[in-house]
Curated annotation (Swiss-Prot):
Keywords: ATP-binding, Ligase, Nucleotide-binding, Protein biosynthesis. It is an enzyme of class 6 (ligase). It catalyses: L-glutamyl-tRNA(Gln) + L-glutamine + ATP + H2O = L-glutaminyl-tRNA(Gln) + L-glutamate + ADP + phosphate + H(+); L-aspartyl-tRNA(Asn) + L-glutamine + ATP + H2O = L-asparaginyl-tRNA(Asn) + L-glutamate + ADP + phosphate + 2 H(+). Allows the formation of correctly charged Asn-tRNA(Asn) or Gln-tRNA(Gln) through the transamidation of misacylated Asp-tRNA(Asn) or Glu-tRNA(Gln) in organisms which lack either or both of asparaginyl-tRNA or glutaminyl-tRNA synthetases. The reaction takes place in the presence of glutamine and ATP through an activated phospho-Asp-tRNA(Asn) or phospho-Glu-tRNA(Gln). Its EC number is 6.3.5.-. This is Glutamyl-tRNA(Gln) amidotransferase subunit C. The keyword Cytoplasm does not apply. GO terms for molecular function: asparaginyl-tRNA synthase (glutamine-hydrolyzing) activity; ATP binding; glutaminyl-tRNA synthase (glutamine-hydrolyzing) activity. GO terms for biological process: regulation of translational fidelity; translation. SUPFAM superfamilies: Glu-tRNAGln amidotransferase C subunit (SSF141000). Belongs to the GatC family. The gene is gatC.
């Protein structure tokens, strides 16, 4: 049997905290699935990677040498820009309210 990392009560609490509706019939499925995922992650963490050269795996990140210098240009006037927005107010772009 797989080691138990989480139990039924923890799954119910997790679903509640995440504002998810979880039917009682599916709770045991989630307990089993979550325990399987955690067990798999335990196996991944246990893999010995000491012989891997870590420096060779970080070259895909963007560094300062990959960025262009910021240069101010005046391709558009304010009027040209505002002509393309749905709603403007006092020379500014009016956007919908996000926070109530």
């Amino acid at each position: 049997m797989t080691q138990s990392y989480v139990n039924k009560e923890e799954i119910i609490s997790l679903a509640k905290n995440a504002a998810l509706e979880l039917e009682e019939a599916h709770v045991e499925e989630f307990v089993t699935s979550m325990n399987n995922v955690i067990a798999l992650m335990q196996e991944v963490v246990a893999i010995d990677i000491s012989d891997i050269i870590l420096e060779a795996t970080v070259h895909h990140f963007v560094g300062p040498e990959d960025l262009r210098e910021d240069m101010v240009t005046s391709d558009f006037t304010r009027e040209e820009f505002l002509a393309n927005v749905p709603v403007s107010l006092g020379g500014l772009v009016k956007v919908p309210t996000v926070i109530k």
